[in-house]
Amino acid sequence: MSTEYPLVGSPETSEYPKYECSLCLKRYKRREHLFRHIGSHTSQRPYQCNSCDGAFQRADVLKRHLRTCDGGASRASTRRRACDRCVRQKKACSSHQPCHSCAKKGAQCLYSTDTGYSSRLSQHSSTNHTPKDQELSTQFTNPPPPPSTSTFNTMMPWGLTMEDLQNFGTSPTNTFFDPASMQYTSPTLPDFSVLPFEGPATFETPVSSDPPRKSLHFLDKFTSNTGLVSSFDCGTHEQREQIAARLDQQILSELQQRIMSMPALGMDIPSPLIMENNSDTSSTSDLPLDWFNDPLSLKTHEILLLVEEVVTIKPRNSSVALDWSSTLRDACLQFFSPSNIRRFLGFYWAIWHPNVNFVHRPTFDMLAAKPTLLAAMALIGACVSPDMPDNEDARTWFNCVEEMVFIDDDFNSDLTYQYSGNIAIQRRKIQAVQAAYIVCLYQNWEGADASKSRIRRYRFATLVSTARDIGITAARHLNYSELGRHEFEWKEYEAREELIRLFTWIFLLDSAFVIFNNLPPRMVIKEIRMHMATPEACFQATTADECHHQLHLFLPARTLYWTTSFRGSFESLCKDDLSVNIRHLLATLGPLNLFALTSAIHSQIFQFRSAVGSFQLRAPIQNALSNWRDIWQLFSSTFPQGITPHMTIEDPHIQPEELWKRMGFFRYAPEYWLLAHLMADRLAVLGTSKPENELEPLDEGPLDPILNRYDQTSMRQVNDLIMGFQTFQI
């Protein structure tokens, strides 16, 4: 019999314990209570006393112990004199690491109740004793350190070198793990509970058969708030809490499975201490056992080395203000731990990905991904997490990840693509640009004002230049509808589509700076001679067969798509006699491309506002506005809301596994169209008025008839404009 749980937001939710232990089925109201309880099912004791060798499972027990600790009384009673294997076999143990018996048999030698004893003993003997009250405060306020090593800059786990680490993960055959453990490389979305329907949102959903409604509720909220969650389409806090609960349950279940499977894998994976007998035992004795069976631990170490590099070797005027220390190293390992990477990427896919969808979810592999991209995606996931500590911890690493992304060799290389070449083999370059774009996102919406200005004025300009170096015209598809299934290369399609969407989103961010910060555009429409993005059904297909089928269905061989560029589509949109075929094509391509077209209209309006006496632009802008409205209505009537991939976060029928497929904030494209329409109308009225004087006096009058201040970090003047439109014209 299935158990019915109350929906989030119902009266009984606040009293119902919703977090369940998968081992003993006990329930808890708070997630941290469940985490504390899970520790009772293991032998790990992460809270350690620096004065003696005492180790505890809970911080409050350590706190009570420190009040009475005399600095060594418990050492003799807590130290294990025999390894686990010798204890089980009831044999004498030499107490070495590894002991003589385990070394002779080639078995894994573990001392489960005295993890890291030699490390703590050496630290205790070389460190002066601090006053007890100070030690109590320090040990209790700081969380238990994650696995740390003093030799990360020269030695990797399993005796790997940096060269081995850089080559790891580039091929499915280049792995040290049992195939069964590879199930964690590209996990599916967790089994989220069905999100509750909270009723209509405060704004009307634009995807409907009606004309675009005259309201700017979303843009009003967008320009009056800061932060990714407050600005974009990330669901309610209750919905994100449910996602977090399911992610935690899945990660805990996987962790327990790995721990339980370790005895069976112990004979297959030698102990790192056996493989490296000459290494410092303190560097690996503190590593949790599940890390040695977790392929993502390599990515954690890669990120750690990159962070250490940008912190210790700061360039001039570096934005990184941190100093490298063992505490910072431990904090980095804890934030980018394998379990946190999985959790943060779970938030990225379910909450954030629909808003900026240029990473191909079905083929994304965490092990093969660049560490810079993985770190940037993890930061976005932490920013949209419902847990405040995740949000605060993410800000610590904003500037570090920004620095390591923009100094990355792949990002700064001079590589250019050939249109006829194999773009799929240049995935590292594409991922480097994706990482740079994600950095621009989280810094512009979550960073400090100085970070926002730096991104807008310098980093984004570098990103646009890198896109031009790659070649915007290289972002084109082959005519897949002319290819048979045996000729269709899914990876090649995915790489080209990622590049097209990446350049599209770069243009959209450029347009956002134009609209909301009144910054002159860095990209011009005439240079965007690339294909438009294929429909979402093609990009979201989970198999090569399904993708090939969707391409044939939406984009037949004779359709205009294969011969039309983004520039050509916009030029056609500005004509007064737009053909029916082009209308149907643009409606078929979906909301992302329509959002890009309405953003292009804003770019033209900025040029119109900034030009002197160029009123000939008024007619093309009016044509584009009229044609876009008709195409959006055609799209809304052809692809009704509630059908994949045109579902929204408010849809009551959305399935948990389809959260990443929903439409993001670009479903509010009609509001962008309405803002452009109102601005064009105001410019038309202002254009008919004649100046009072032939020569305008020096330092008098506004710089611009609509927005007076250029390159403004705050969106206040745009919000004032929107409020004025809603008050006087709607």
From Swiss-Prot:
Keyword Ribonucleoprotein: no
Gene Ontology terms: cellular component: chromatin; nucleus
Regions recorded as binding DNA: 83-109
SMART domains linked to this entry: GAL4, ZnF_C2H2
Bias (Polar residues) ranges: 120-129
GO molecular function terms noted in the UniProt entry: DNA-binding transcription factor activity, RNA polymerase II-specific; RNA polymerase II cis-regulatory region sequence-specific DNA binding; zinc ion binding
GO terms under biological process: DNA-templated transcription
C2H2-type zinc finger span: 19-41, 47-69
Positions of the UniProt region annotated as Disordered: 120-151
UniProt-listed Pfam families: Fungal_trans, Zn_clus
Keyword Methyltransferase in record: no
InterPro entries with a match to the protein in the record: Transcription_factor_dom_fun, VerF-like, Zn2-C6_fun-type_DNA-bd_sf, Zn2Cys6_DnaBD, Znf_C2H2_sf, Znf_C2H2_type
UniProt cross-references to SUPFAM superfamilies, sorted A to Z: beta-beta-alpha zinc fingers (SSF57667), Zn2/Cys6 DNA-binding domain (SSF57701)
Keywords: DNA-binding, Metal-binding, Nucleus, Repeat, Transcription, Transcription regulation, Zinc, Zinc-finger
Subcellular location: Nucleus
Biological role: Transcription factor; part of the gene cluster that mediates the biosynthesis of the neurotoxin verrucosidin, a methylated alpha-pyrone polyketide that inhibits oxidative phosphorylation in mitochondria and thereby causes neurological diseases.
PANTHER family: MIP31509P, TRANSCRIPTION FACTOR WITH C2H2 AND ZN(2)-CYS(6) DNA BINDING DOMAIN (EUROFUNG)-RELATED
Protein name: Transcription factor verF
Record organism: Penicillium polonicum
Lineage: Eukaryota, Fungi, Dikarya, Ascomycota, Pezizomycotina
Gene that this polypeptide is encoded by: verF
